[in-house]
Amino acid sequence: MKLEMICTGEEVLAGQIVDTNAAWFANTLMGKGIECQRRITVGDRLEDLVAVFKERSTEADIIMVNGGLGPTSDDLSTEAMALAMGVPLVESKEWRTKLEAWFTRNNRVMAASNLKQALLPEGAVMIDNPVGTACGFAVKLNRAWLFFTPGVPFEFKRMVKEQFIPFVEKQFALSESVSVKKLLTLGRGESSLADELDVIQLPEGVTLGYRSYMPYIEIKLFARGQSAIDSLPDIEAQVKKVLGNGIVAENITTLDQEIHERLINSGLSLSVAESCTGGMITSGLVAFAGSSSYLHQGLVTYSNEAKVKVLGVNSQTLDDYGAVSIATVEEMAKGARGILGSDYALATSGIAGPEGGTDEKPVGTVAIALATKSGIYSQMVKLPGRSRALVRALSTAVAYDMLRRELLGEAVIVDYSSFSRFCK
């Protein structure tokens, strides 16, 4: 089966918005063992849409068309498909009824232009949109099924999960088994990872890919066919042996997600005191529903005065060692934990740059501490040559990983090999 995607819209083509739908779609389908082999972006020009629908329908088996189903004059996907098929547009009585009910239910007056959304190419199969006004539909042209969906992300994603994937599984025999394993690494670049893992011989049916979203690189092991799936545990073990502590999580997207889930399940609590990370540790956790069950407080104590008055850091410690020091960050973590009696507390203090560094403590020097009931773990990491944003993101990730390792009963301070450090 050959799957392609056509994305529509001048704003996407011009780069005015980032097409997150396409990335999500390809990643979601890959998890089902369905590879998207081509993606095309087309602007809001009727003749271009007609041409690309005709052309790709002779090459692909199924085509996801995203966007252009709205009520405005530049929403042209439905009209273009009808022209490509050589059929008229006809009103779907079923969708018009649903459309009118949607506006009534939401206490809104339906504009006459919205009736355009009930028009479908003659012979089209209506695809329900349970959360919006744009009617999805599927048509057969030449060798391809074309599946039309709205560009609104939450509408699109729901229709893919509830309508498109079952449609594909019904229309095409997807009998071959697939398995995907994802490993999250911290601090390394793609080229470095590729060089290190080049020693691993991949059996037939197993592929290894990388996805960068710094500070993380995700390694994806994809196996197609039972023989390849059976070999996956051995390949995974080889990857882990090569990368060691560089692997910080499995089958999740970010460390904050793992920390959130582990704290939820453990019933343990956390406080956070941040300087150079400026709330990033706290913000990452608050993004997940239910974080109030474990997150006691998130304090941004940027100034020395705040460190002293809010966290109880000894002013003599600041005078003797400076704000960016293991001694200071340990007192920050201890103070944050003590305010509300949290089980754990994380603290950071560093020089994110681009200015403020010294010979002894250059830009990229960050102190991180984890306070527990039994003691304090701390380390100073050196992140030279990174942007301010990346220094802060890496520092946040290292703090998360220290807590993750503590929750798992592992060594809290480890060598990531991708940046230098020293600890107390």
Swiss-Prot record:
Segments crossing the lipid bilayer: none
SUPFAM superfamilies from the UniProt entry: CinA-like, Molybdenum cofactor biosynthesis proteins
CDD domains, sorted: cinA
Gene3D superfamilies in the record: CinA-like, MoaB/Mog-like domain
Similarity remark: Belongs to the CinA family.
NCBIfam families: cinA_nterm, PncC_domain
HAMAP family (alphabetical): CinA_B (MF_00226_B)
Protein's name in the database: CinA-like protein
